[in-house]
């Protein structure tokens, strides 16, 4: 189901018209599954679809690649996110009233009638672009190492989920579900609730000219919320949480020069590195 962007022409078949409907960031916000479901539930469904065709041993790495790619697809629609925010804030428009005809079409999609080979190629190409945009999370020669049918079924589950939201809780839910719980328990790891992190950061009240290091950073909750806190000081009237909004050079420099995190878990390091790179845009 989509909010209509065009009407069919008199020469156009219904099937051609349906297939030609664009899915933009506006559509994603309207039909976001997180309006009615939790990400843990959705990720659990994705894991089941993955396990139906592929080995569960590589579920974390492969689903991590898909989430990484999905975040990239949302991030490169940053101009559209800014337009939506401005029109809703200053133009007093509702989301459905916003004209999205000039918006970018999202690419992390899989239509029901689309061949699995075509979906795999499209998502693989998007993944390659994401790696070039955000190097250091995955090896440059890494590929999607799952069945093509698995890619299609997992993309269908994730495509109507808006991962960039006002806080890290949404993405944290995804990775908490994916990270091997047995391994976490053996090493005494856990995910600190975000409201606890928010409280601690507000109590410490870090300033943009201070440096911080977390020597057991895990998925980088404390470093990320320190970043958000300092960004809010640098630009108090700007959206400063986990959004697709563009960052100023000063904000990016603060992340690169002042915030550091360490951890002995390879999985946690990769998750934390990705969140820092994505939220700080490099």
Residue ranges and their predicted role:
Residues 1-58, 149-165:
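Short, basic/polar, glycine-containing "phosphate-handling" surface segments that engage DNA
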Residues 68-180:
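Long recognition/docking surfaces used for binding and targeting
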Residues 61-74, 274-278:
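Short, hydrophobic/amphipathic alpha-helical patches that form generic packing surfaces
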Residues 58-63, 67, 150, 170, ...:
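Residue-level detector of well-ordered alpha-helical segments, enriched
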Residues 33-44, 171-177, 246-247:
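Active-site-adjacent bridging/hinge elements
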Residues 50-55, 77-82, 185:
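Short, polar/flexible loop-turn hinges at active-site or ligand-entry regions and domain interfaces
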Residues 186-282:
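Conserved S-adenosyl-L-methionine
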Residues 53, 57, 144, 164, ...:
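Conserved phosphate/pyrophosphate-binding and hydrolysis machinery centered on Walker-type P-loop NTPases
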């Amino acid at each position: 189901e989509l909010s209509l962007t065009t009407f069919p022409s008199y020469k156009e078949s219904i099937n051609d018209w349906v297939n030609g409907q664009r899915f933009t960031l506006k559509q994603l916000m309207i039909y976001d599954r997180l309006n009615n479901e939790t990400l843990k539930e959705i990720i659990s469904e994705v894991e089941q679809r993955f396990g139906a065709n592929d080995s569960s041993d590589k579920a974390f790495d492969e689903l991590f690649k898909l989430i990484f790619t999905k975040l990239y697809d949302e991030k490169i629609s940053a101009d559209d996110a800014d337009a939506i925010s401005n029109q809703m804030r200053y133009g007093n428009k509702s989301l459905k009233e916003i004209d999205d005809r000039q918006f970018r079409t999202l690419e992390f999609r899989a239509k029901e009638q689309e061949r699995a080979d075509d979906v795999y190629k499209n998502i693989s190409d998007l993944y390659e672009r994401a790696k070039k945009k955000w190097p250091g999370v995955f090896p440059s020669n890494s590929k999607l190492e799952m069945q093509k049918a698995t890619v299609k079924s997992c993309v269908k589950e994730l495509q109507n989920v808006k991962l960039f939201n006002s806080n890290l809780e949404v993405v944290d839910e995804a990775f908490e579900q994916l990270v091997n719980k047995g391994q976490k328990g053996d090493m005494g790891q856990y995910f600190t609730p975000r409201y606890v992190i928010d409280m601690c950061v507000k109590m410490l009240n870090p300033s943009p000219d201070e440096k911080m290091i977390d020597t057991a950073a895990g998925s980088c909750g404390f470093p990320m919320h320190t970043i958000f806190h300092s960004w809010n000081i640098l630009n108090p009237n700007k959206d400063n949480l986990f959004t697709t909004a563009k960052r100023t050079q000063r904000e990016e420099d603060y992340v690169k020069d002042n915030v550091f995190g360490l951890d002995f878990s390879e999985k946690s390091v990769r998750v934390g590195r990705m969140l820092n790179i994505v939220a700080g845009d490099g």
